[in-house]
């Protein structure tokens, strides 16, 4: 808030506008220039544990900057489908926000690629297919 003022809005029960769901949330994500991944807890360091917003934000059309938590790079390609910042390094996050606020075409290309990757690989259908394949492949 100090750095970006009214251009920064925190959505959620503990945020500026409370909880938003459904179509209004789609519109917010799609119209925002940048959505920041929500793992800002600096004490958080669990590999392969990240929020569903990793998939929700690009799936709803957002350009996303997300903390580089181990395993995220297996889901999206950094710099091509989303942008990763060093977890806990708020200077790195600010630098990337400032860069992408002034590079519209690059930001839009990454946003679109992230949306397509999500629709291709990160839907509930693909998750259920993976679960069922794993269960049936490992049947005793």
Language model regions located:
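A charged, aromatic-enriched C-terminal amphipathic alpha-helix characteristic of glycosyltransferases
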Residues: 105-133
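Two-component system phosphotransfer/interaction surface
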Residues: 90-102, 128-136
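Short, contiguous hydrophobic alpha-helices characteristic of membrane insertion segments
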Residues: 64-67, 81-88, 131-140
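Short basic/hydrophobic patches in alpha-helices and adjacent helix-turn junctions
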Residues: 56, 98-102, 116, 120
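Nucleotide-sugar donor-binding catalytic core of glycosyltransferases
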Residues: 1-78, 138
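Generic anion/oxyanion-binding catalytic loop in active/binding sites
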Residues: 17, 46, 82, 103, ...
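Short, hydrophobic/aromatic alpha-helical segments in well-folded domains
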Residues: 24, 53, 96, 113-114
């Amino acid at each position: 808030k100090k750095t970006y003022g009214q251009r920064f809005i925190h959505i959620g029960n503990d945020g500026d506008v409370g909880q938003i769901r459904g179509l209004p949330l789609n519109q917010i994500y799609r119209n925002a220039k940048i959505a920041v991944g929500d793992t800002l807890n600096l004490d958080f360091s669990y590999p392969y544990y990240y929020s569903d917003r990793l998939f929700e934000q690009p799936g709803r059309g957002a350009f996303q900057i997300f903390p580089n938590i181990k395993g995220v790079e297996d889901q999206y390609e950094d710099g091509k489908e989303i942008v990763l910042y060093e977890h806990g390094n708020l200077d790195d996050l600010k630098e990337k926000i400032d860069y992408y606020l002034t590079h519209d075409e690059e930001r839009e290309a990454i946003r679109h690629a992230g949306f397509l990757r999500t629709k291709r690989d990160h839907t509930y259908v693909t998750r259920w297919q993976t679960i069922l394949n794993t269960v049936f492949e490992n049947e005793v």
